[in-house]
UniProtKB/Swiss-Prot annotation:
Subunit-structure text: The potassium channel is probably composed of a homo- or heterotetrameric complex of pore-forming alpha subunits that can associate with modulating beta subunits. Interacts with DNAJB12 and DNAJB14; chaperones DNAJB12 and DNAJB14 promote tetramerization. Heteromultimer with KCNH6/ERG2 and KCNH7/ERG3. Interacts with ALG10B. Forms a stable complex with KCNE1 or KCNE2, and that this heteromultimerization regulates inward rectifier potassium channel activity. Interacts with CANX. The core-glycosylated, but not the fully glycosylated form interacts with RNF207.
Domain called PAC: residue spans: 92-144
Biased composition (Basic residues): 885-894
Protein name: Voltage-gated inwardly rectifying potassium channel KCNH2
Compositionally biased intervals (Polar residues): 254-271
Residue ranges of the region described as Disordered: 233-316, 873-991, 1125-1162
Length: 1162
């Protein structure tokens, strides 16, 4: 297998670094994006959620000012200081009282820390929260109600209060900086202070504003950290007085928050547009000028230096007593006129503000970059080397550190490998054969290293091994998390725990340490310790075990090396016994006699070293292969015992290596063959399609990492070989972490969990890979199990998600999959579990008892559905009004509203009882709309989709005149009677044709005082022709729509003429039946002629009732009325478009609900 390179692709480790550092310190923090106009929260850790009591889904996309934690005891000054910190680029600490979700109050120290990108621009803010004390301990009420808590609905988080940062003309203030009055600069001081003049003239009654006199000129010391005496001595006693009163519809922010009907106001920093209610910011040259201004000695500035006539006011300034302090702690010098306005934000909170409004870095911020970095490091308790930047960056490699996969390290490893092989061969040989010869020739003249070339080589090997130890202390490694570790300290610890001891023993130069002692045999034995390096050689060569030829070669080399070692031992045994034997029966004496070189009586002479080594190697090879010829035989007991051991070793090696070579190769290369086959396919794919190099490198790196992660195992292929019950158990084990720790799956039965586990699929994504693109169809729900991702809209990061977060769309609220409103991109190597919407809904249909719990406990951290891209999709107002449905069949949902309890024959009167709000199955509008008073079905009705069956394709409504109170003798329920006196409990398929006609009776005359009731819908076998589908602008032109409307208008004109005549005939027939009980409808006057009627109508008597039969007859007439020849054919598929809705009608939630003037209940 290739060398493990680890995660070397550029990763965005911003979130991982912050979490790793903060979680160990039990921090509570949030991360906000400084480039969106509301500084929305894009990440919050579990500690913050536990602190405030809100879930992550409720906190995400909230303003980072945390105004949803404000309450009665929250200081406005502290809140303003936090807002000011978001304007600058320096950190600030503020003490403020916050409220939890349960209403309990606590005092918190908030650290606002900016985060910069590689260009030095502030792109994010980290807000760290530290609890100082509980308010209950200092005498506050037990529970103060948090009136600003957000709604528990996850959809409400996107429309809650937002924090808009607007900066007015900064260039104009920059140009005016040089025009400050020269009289105010007579003192030699630092022109860094900021003086705030505030006019106490109240603002306009329609706005609620809080002038930021304190906010625009404060630093960390004056933000509740400096002594009160110094601040009072510098500023004066009047600095704590309020500077502006809050006026508007509500007397105070608290009163406004107490009103449940009031829309959530947004806290925004906006420029004051009134010259009478804004604060001017001007510069002070020194502390003397500040004292003069505090005492009123400094005259007001000229008009060109401010925006209006301002009254000097003693305000909170820098907590300093000298000019040097002003130089050191000067604040932003060009802050424009700012007020804190509570306004309603109707726009998209995620859209970035213009460049002029988004730039919040002061002109001198570039000069303070190094100071900011030091302070950020102090606040975060992080080292400067690990302070992250929010960008894709390669792993940090320390200086003088060698990558373990670099070319230099590869060459060096091969060099060390050759030296180790040399050591393994020559160390036993020199210890057995050469030491005896050296002793025998010790009387020879001393010629140094020239006579001993192997001694020089041994010295070089020792030096190389020592250098290798030093290199290993600076070589990176891959940890258990597949991360490349380059820190010298961690590398040293890892090396000490691993191969350091073996390398150290193998590198000891024993011949130099024992030089001159004369014990050459001891030196030779100690040198055998170098053979310990063979363990590392085996580990290095294991990567080549995937090649068949290499394995055969390695096996042969191993066999030869073992034979070499045994030959050295065989010679050492014969050489040791030779001087002590009286009878010359050893194998050496026999060898000398055979080759004609016998030993003399003094033990000298005999065969040469070459003859001895070759003979010993011949004996060991023949013994290991069990092919002994007997020409070299053991004679002494020691030689026979050694021969037995050699035979045992040889039998094992021969049987395990040579006897099973094919089996070994097949077993070792099964995975390797699959790897190379798949890799070959990838390369052929790259070559065939001519993929460019950057993309080719991504493909290869992803394949290699995925192969090392899964080892080339195809889970689907493996699972298909097992029965379904075993497949479910395996999938349950693989997804056990998700099913155990994810809240929506708690409480599910084991059978339900097994069914869900079968539907989950695991996705692995490298850094920089885009999982979902903007506009893609959302067909699955994603659960993050490892890594972190970011969600972008354009180039703006709107959310950062990590482990255990969920993103997608709420499947129970939409019948059809929506489209993504942003890009989802991986920051690190991520593992995600995804389940398709069809599979999830199918499982929940099988377990309806678990479905309620699942939908109620599912909290999607970020909703990717883009409602603006889908015409007629329900908005947040509809969803908050009860637009909650459950899946009853596949892709069919049942609306749970108050109307479900009514019987099919009951009549619900508009204006009596609770009106249905939102896109219900039988009502899509409300009376009093801008185009009529009749309820109508909008195009966003989920029941009108094609995949819900023909019975749900349309929702016809029946319109009947609103009746007066029913007489006591009338039948209950108010159903109209047929001619036979029976109740009509069935609906004509065309009886709802008038549901889409806006105020059709207005053609007869004045319809004032008449209301229409909504009858329960009945399934129609075929859709009405008047239910015109909403045509797509891309498929039908505007002229087709206009011609269709003209045809319908002509139909209505003919309908008026015939309806007047038919009504007279019908009413005369009804008046003859005196035995019938009068129905429950009030009398209707005879309608006059229509505005376009060609002939006058015959006068008739008063209309006593209007039955369903009459309306049914009229509906049938309309259904079978032919269209003119020039009118286009009406399509029958797609969502229906009611005639009461104009062509440019927007979403229903955007239209305010009005009650008609003739409504009796208004």
């Amino acid at each position: 297998m290739p060398v493990r390179r680890g995660h070397v692709a550029p990763q965005n480790t911003f979130l991982d670094t912050i979490i790793r550092k903060f979680e160990g310190q039990s921090r509570k923090f949030i991360i906000a994006n400084a480039r969106v106009e509301n500084c929305a929260v894009i990440y919050c850790n579990d500690g913050f959620c536990e602190l405030c009591g809100y879930s992550r889904a409720e906190v995400m996309q909230r303003p980072c000012t945390c105004d949803f934690l404000h309450g009665p005891r929250t200081q406005r000054r502290a809140a303003a200081q936090i807002a000011q910190a978001l304007l600058g680029a320096e950190e600030r600490k503020v003490e403020i009282a916050f409220y939890r979700k349960d209403g309990s109050c606590f005092l918190c120290l908030v650290d606002v820390v900016p985060v910069k990108n590689e260009d030095g621009a502030v792109i994010m803010f980290i807000l760290n929260f530290e609890v100082v004390m509980e308010k209950d301990m200092v005498g506050s009420p037990a529970h103060d109600t948090n009136h600003r808590g957000p709604s528990t609905s996850w959809l409400a988080s996107g429309r809650a209060k937002t924090f808009r940062l607007k900066l007015p003309a900064l260039l104009a203030l920059t140009a005016r900086e040089s025009s400050v009055r020269t009289g105010s600069m007579h003192s030699a001081g630092a022109p860094g202070a900021v003086v705030v003049d505030v006019d106490l003239t109240p603002a306009a009654p329609s706005s609620e504003s809080l002038a930021l006199d304190e906010v625009s000129a404060m630093d960390n010391h004056v933000a509740g950290l400096g002594p009160a005496e110094e601040r009072r001595a510098l500023v004066g006693p009047g600095s704590a007085s309020p500077v502006a009163s809050i006026r508007g519809p509500h007397p105070s922010p608290r009163a406004q928050s107490l009103n449940p009907d009031a829309s959530g106001s947004s806290c925004s920093l906006a420029r004051t547009r009134s010259r009478e209610s804004c604060a001017s910011v001007r510069r002070a040259s020194s502390a003397d000028d500040i004292e003069a201004m505090r005492a009123g000695a400094l005259p007001p500035p000229p008009r060109h230096a401010s925006t209006g006539a301002m009254h000097p006011l003693r305000s909170g300034l820098l907590n300093s007593t000298s000019d040097s302090d002003l130089v050191r702690y000067r604040t932003i010098s060009k802050i424009p006129q700012i007020t804190l306005n509570f306004v309603d934000l109707k726009g998209d909170p995620f859209l970035a503000s213009p460049t002029s409004d988004r730039e919040i870095i002061a002109p001198k911020i570039k000069e303070r970059t190094h100071n900011v970095t030091e302070k950020v490091t102090q606040v975060l308790s992080l080292g400067a080397d690990v302070l992250p930047e929010y960008k894709l960056q390669a792993p940090r490699i320390h200086r003088w550190t060698i990558l373990h996969y670099s070319p230099f390290k590869a060459v060096w490893d091969w060099l060390i490998l050759l030296l180790v092989i040399y050591t393994a061969v020559f160390t036993p040989y020199s210890a057995a054969f050469l030491l005896k010869e050296t002793e025998d020739g010790s009387q020879a003249p001393d010629c140094g290293y020239a006579c001993q070339p192997l001694a020089v080589v041994d010295l070089i090997v020792d030096i190389m091994f020592i250098v290798d130890i030093l290199i290993n202390f600076r070589t990176t490694y891959v940890n258990a998390n597949e991360e490349v570790v380059s820190h010298p300290g961690r590398i040293a610890v890892h090396y000490f725990k691993g191969w350091f001891l073996i390398d150290m023993v193998a590198a000891i130069p024993f011949d130099l340490l024992i030089f001159g002692s004369g014990s050459e045999e001891l030196i030779g034995l100690l040198k055998t310790a170098r053979l310990l390096r063979l363990v590392r050689v085996a580990r290095k060569l294991d990567r080549y075990s995937e090649y068949g030829a290499a394995v055969l070669f390695l096996l042969m080399c191993t066999f030869a090396l073992i034979a070499h070692w045994l030959a050295c031992i065989w010679y050492a045994i014969g050489n040791m016994e030779q001087p002590h034997m009286d009878s010359h029966i050893g194998w050496l004496h026999n060898l000398g006699d055979q080759i004609g070189k016998p030993y003399n009586s003094s033990g000298l002479g005999g065969p040469s070293i070459k003859d001895k080594y070759v003979t010993a190697l011949y004996f060991t090879f023949s013994s290991l292969t069990s092919v002994g010829f007997g020409n070299v035989s053991p004679n002494t007991n020691s030689e026979k015992i050694f021969s037995i051991c050699v035979m045992l070793i040889g039998s094992l090696m021969y049987a395990s290596i040579f006897g099973n070579v094919s089996a070994i190769i097949q077993r070792l290369y099964s995975g390797t063959a699959r790897y190379h086959t798949q890799m070959l396919r990838v390369r052929e794919f790259i070559r065939f399609h001519q993929i460019p190099n950057p993309l080719r490198q991504r493909l290869e790196e992803y394949f290699q990492h995925a192969w090392s992660y899964t080892n080339g195992i195809d889970m689907n292929a493996v699972l298909k070989g097992f029965p379904e019950c075993l497949q479910a158990d395996i999938c349950l084990h693989l997804n056990r972490s998700l099913l155990q720790h994810c809240k929506p799956f708690r409480g599910a039965t084991k059978g339900c969990l097994r069914a869900l586990a079968m539907k989950f699929k695991t996705t692995h994504a490298p850094p920089g890979d885009t999982l979902v693109h903007a506009g893609d169809l959302l067909t699955a729900l994603y659960f993050i199990s490892r890594g972190s991702i970011e969600i972008l809209r354009g180039d703006v990061v709107v959310a950062i998600l990590g482990k255990n977060d969920i993103f997608g769309e709420p499947l129970n609220l939409y019948a059809r999959p929506g489209k993504s409103n942003g890009d989802v991109r991986a920051l690190t190597y991520c593992d995600l579990h995804k389940i398709h919407r069809d599979d999830l809904l199918e499982v929940l249909d099988m377990y309806p008892e678990f479905s309620d719990h699942f939908w109620s406990s599912l909290e999607i951290t970020f909703n990717l559905r883009d409602t603006n891209m889908i015409p007629g999709s329900p908005g947040s107002a509809e969803l908050e009004s009860g637009f909650n449905r459950q899946r009853k069949r596949k892709l069919s949902f049942r609306r749970r509203t108050d109307k479900d309890t009514e019987q099919p024959g009951e009549v619900s009167a508009l204006g009596q009882g609770p009106a249905r709000v939102g896109p219900g199955p039988s009502c899509r509008g409300q009376p009093g709309g801008p185009w009529g008073e009749s309820p109508s079905s909008g195009p966003s009705s989920p029941e009108s989709s094609e995949d819900e069956g023909p019975g749900r394709s349309s929702s016809p409504l029946r319109l009947v005149p609103f009746s007066s109170p029913r007489p006591p003798g009338d039948p209950p329920g108010g159903e109209p009677l047929t001619e036979d006196g029976e109740k009509s409990d069935t609906c004509n398929p065309l009886s709802g044709a008038f549901s889409g006609v806006s105020n059709i009776f207005s053609f007869w005359g004045d319809s004032r005082g008449r209301q229409y009731q909504e009858l329960p819908r009945c399934p129609a076998p075929a859709p009405s022709l008047l239910n015109i589908p909403l045509s797509s602008p891309g498929r039908r032109s505007r002229g087709d729509v206009e011609s269709r409307l003209d045809a319908l208008q002509r139909q209505l004109n003919r309908l008026e003429t015939r309806l007047s005549a038919d009504m007279a005939t019908v009413l005369q027939l009804l008046q003859r039946q005196m035995t019938l009980v009068p129905p429950a409808y009030s009398a209707v006057t005879t309608p006059g002629p229509g505005p376009t009627s060609a002939s006058p109508l015959l006068p008739v008597g008063p209309v006593p009732t209007l039955t369903l039969d009459s309306l049914s007859q009229v509906s049938q007439f309309v259904a079978f009325e032919e269209l003119p020849a020039g009118a286009p054919e009406l399509p029958q598929d797609g969502p229906t478009r009611r005639l009461s809705l104009p062509g440019q009608l927007g979403a229903l939630t955007s239209q305010p609900l009005h009650r008609h003037g003739s409504d009796p209940g208004s």
